[in-house]
Amino acid sequence: MLDVNSSYSYLLWCRDFAATSVVARDESGTAAAFATGYIRPEQPGTLVIWQIAVDGKRRGRGLGGAMLDHLTGRLRSRGVLQRMETTISAENEASQRLFHSFAARHGASVEHEPLFPARLFPDAHESEHLYRIGPLAESPTPTPGTQYSETRRTRSVAS
C-alpha cells in the first residue's frame, strides 16, 4: 500500500529531487506511474527509492522496472551510482518481485533485514524491511517492451 503524502510534499519533491525521480506519462500526457528517490547523504553511491507507483490498469507491463532502469541509467551515466535501497513491507509481494527482478537485470545481489517495526508508526502501518541491492552491473539487461521519450524533466511511456 502506497503512503499518500500531501500535494505540497510532492511539489517539493519534484523541485528538489527531480534528478532522482521520474514520472511516466501516456500519449495524452496523463501520469501513468512515478518513482521518487534520493541519494543517501552518508552513502553518495546509493539511490534510495522512496516511493514507486503504477496506475492500476497499467500494472504488469514492466513500467515499474523500466522506471527503475531509467533512473539508475541516468545516475550511472553521471558516475554516481553503485547501489540501490528501498523499504518494503513483508506483505507487499509485488514490490518484492519488482526489486528482485531489477536486481537480476542488473547482476546485483539483494539483502534485506527489518528496519522499522510496526510499533514505530503512529497509524496502522506494517513493519518495513530495508532492501539493499548491489553492486549494480555496468550493462543491465533491458526491460522489454517499454520505451521512453524525452519530455522536459519527465519521461513519457506509451500505454
Task: Kindly label every feature range from the protein language model.
Residues M1-E27, A31, T36:
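Active-site rim helix/loop that mediates acceptor-substrate recognition in acyltransferases
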Residues R40-I49, R59, R78-Q82:
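A conserved beta-turn-beta hairpin within the catalytic core of GNAT-like acetyltransferases
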Residues Q51-R59, I88-S89:
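A short, internal acetyl-CoA/4′-phosphopantetheine-binding micro-motif in the GNAT/acyltransferase core
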Residues V54, G60-R74, R97-S101:
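Conserved acetyl-CoA-binding loop-helix of GNAT-fold acetyltransferases
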Residues G65, A90-H112, P122:
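Conserved active-site alpha-helix within GNAT-family acetyltransferase domains
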Residues L75-A90:
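Conserved GNAT acetyl-CoA-binding A-motif
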Residues H106-S159:
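C-terminal "cap" of GNAT-fold acetyltransferases
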